[in-house]
């Protein structure tokens, strides 16, 4: 069995299966029925969370333990949250089929609906590029881009109409997302996409992240494996997870190139 060149830390999976506890862990009670889902810390130290049960977005102050909720509208289902450098939250809402911006200070909200041709898109994941544009995916077979400066939302069908899952931007500005048994490369100029099949046996690529030299890491939630693709030489490598029953979903690569 080959060892991972970077630590793969299935921390929360391990905790849920063993009952172990984190040293110094702290719990924050929320309003009854909040049903928190997506979570995103912002640069100012607050934590945004999707209160799926209340059709709202919450903001928690970990220092005081106080939280407030911002109503997103009837039928809202916040699926993913990204925080920008100013501390604002950008919410992918699958129920409203829209992206919402919630201000980090005054908590005012602004809605950017998706074009009618992408209804419902099944909004899934999002990431900012270096130009401040928000790239996003939809599980119903779409990828798109929101340019806040132009207030423009563009959407394109994913290759073969398959679900578009996790999305990332490499250090050199390339946009990639996971699509079950493939990775998809998006042209940042016109939104066109090229599908790159993963090795045979890959079942369900979900999370994706890029390291400091542009290699792509992806989790296979159907095969309990971690994959790495190097665009520089088109090479693939994969490693089995310690638990063959694991179903890895989200994936992040931190500033030290550690895969979580």
Segments predicted by a language model, with ranges:
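Residue-level detector of Asp-centered blade-edge/turn motifs that repeat once per structural unit
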Residues: 41-44, 83-86, 128-131, 169-172, ...
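Surface loop/turn motifs at the tips and blade-to-blade linkers of beta-strand repeat domains
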Residues: 28-32, 71-74, 113-118, 157-160, ...
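Short loop/turn segments that connect beta-strands within beta-propeller blades
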Residues: 61-65, 103-107, 147-151, 187-191, ...
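Conserved beta-strand positions in repeat-built beta-propeller and related beta-rich domains
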Residues: 48-53, 89-96, 134-140, 175-181, ...
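Beta-rich catalytic cores
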Residues: 35, 77, 95, 121-122, ...
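A short loop-to-beta-strand structural motif that recurs across blades of beta-propeller domains
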Residues: 56-58, 97-101, 142-144, 182-184, ...
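Beta-strand-rich domains and repeat architectures in extracellular enzymes and scaffolds
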Residues: 28-55
């Amino acid at each position: 069995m080959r060892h991972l060149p970077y630590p793969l830390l299935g921390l929360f999976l391990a905790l849920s299966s063993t009952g172990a506890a984190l040293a110094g862990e702290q719990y924050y009670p929320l309003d009854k029925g909040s049903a928190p889902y997506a979570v995103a810390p912002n640069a100012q130290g607050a934590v945004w969370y999707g209160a799926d049960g209340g059709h709202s977005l919450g903001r928690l102050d970990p220092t005081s333990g106080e939280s407030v909720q911002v109503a997103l509208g009837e039928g809202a289902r916040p699926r993913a949250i990204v925080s920008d450098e100013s501390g604002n939250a950008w919410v992918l809402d699958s129920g409203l089929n829209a992206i919402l911006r919630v201000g980090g200070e005054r908590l005012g909200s602004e809605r950017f609906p998706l074009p009618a041709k992408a209804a419902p898109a099944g909004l899934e994941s999002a990431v900012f590029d270096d130009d401040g544009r928000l790239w996003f995916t939809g599980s119903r077979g779409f990828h798109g881009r929101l340019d806040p400066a132009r207030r423009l939302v563009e959407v394109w069908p994913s290759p073969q109409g398959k679900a578009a899952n996790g999305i990332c931007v490499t250090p050199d500005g390339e946009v990639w997302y996971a699509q079950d048994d493939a990775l998809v490369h998006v042209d940042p100029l016109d939104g066109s996409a090229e599908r790159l099949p993963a090795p045979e046996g890959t079942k369900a690529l979900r999370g994706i992240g890029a390291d400091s030299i542009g290699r792509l890491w992806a989790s296979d939630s159907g095969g309990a494996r971690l994959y790495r693709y190097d665009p520089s030489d088109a090479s693939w490598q994969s490693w089995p997870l310690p638990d063959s029953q694991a179903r890895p979903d989200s994936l992040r690569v931190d500033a030290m190139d550690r895969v979580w």
